[in-house]
UniProtKB/Swiss-Prot annotation:
PROSITE patterns documented for this protein: C2
Subunit structure: Homodimer or homotrimer (possible).
Protein name: Synaptotagmin-B
Annotated C2 domain residues: 159-278, 290-423
Organism: Diplobatis ommata
Amino acid sequence: MQAEMNQSAEVTMKTFFTMKTRETHPQAFVAPMATATMMPIDTGDNSTEAGVPGEGKNDVFEKLKEKFMNELQKIPLPPWALIAIAIVSGLLLLTCCLCICKKCCCKKKKNKKEKGKGKKNDINMKDVKGSGGNQDDDDAETGLTEGEDKEEEAKEEEKLGKIQFSLDYDFQANQLTVGIIQAAELPALDMGGTSDPYVKVFLLPDKKKKYETKVQKKTLNPTFNESFVFKVPYQELGGKTLMMAVYDFDRFSKHDCIGQVTVLMTKVDLGQQLEEWRDLESAEKEEPEKLGDICTSLRYVPTAGKLTVCILEAKNLKKMDVGGLSDPYVKIHLLQNGKRLKKKKTTVKKNTLNPYYNESFSFEIPFEQIQKVQVCVTVLDYDKIGKNDAIGKIFVGSNASGTELRHWSDMLANPRRPIAQWHSLKPEEEVDVALGLKK
């Protein structure tokens, strides 16, 4: 047994030595390789049989290597150049591989994100479907109306106060008596936290006929106790609307409308006296009404102290009569410190909205006083029965503004020369405030 083991060990050592020598010197040991493979081995070791295919592969590799080296020797380049080319080629391949890897990674990340978003959208859509489509529609509608609701709430919160009035109709005299009793909880429009309220009363659509209460100074709860009478036949009263507007008086600017109340006469039981409170509503802002234009000429002679005012013509006057025309005439007042010193007036022009006058009026004014006076020009509609209503008004003087001040300055800069200019008529109240005239 010991002898057999020693014999197998010797065979193994010989085989190992033979393979090593073949690797280093393959051509010198081709013949012995065949004898080694044909030796019988009793121990059953198949290591020599496994070496046969390995030796064939090595031969092929060696042949390819020899061919490659032969081809390299044929290339007319030095070895270092070939090595450099190989290194550059390897680097290029490496960079290409890195770029491809990065692109693949980026695509994977994008796909993951899109999948995540898709999942979220799916969840949201499920939530929407679960809540129901009708609910979404309702939410959209409520979203659109939220702004409107806020505006309505703001309007409701903005309280303008209230007014107490009375109505009484006399069927025998055909007249409506409107009583303005008091107002309460008015907003403060002045700097001191108060207001100077008064009330205007109209029986629309006729704005020509209006009444005004007295101004109650520095109060938010004024008491008026004033009555006004409108002579209206009962048959015509159904088409009328009573309007009561509360204003804040301001001596130096336009009066602000605090609020108003409108009463449709068709909804009022005139068989008995009515007395009630009503909340004031905000007045709708109306564009300024066009009253017409007037052309005047001014001439001043300093040495003689003589001012000549010529009323030339007017155009596009407001319609004041039922027939759509007016009977206009012009009043000229000479004022100083809000006091009327002298008064002149033109003739009446019947049934026209574009009257032509060419009438002159003279006033004696010393040169040292010319900067202290104002000339007020008022266009009125003549009425045989009732009061003559003012259509519009302007004034010129050193304290005027706009075209009126420019006209006055041109007159003083050009003594003895008549200077003519057109002026747009303004509401009577606005001009009276600017002049400081009393109500």
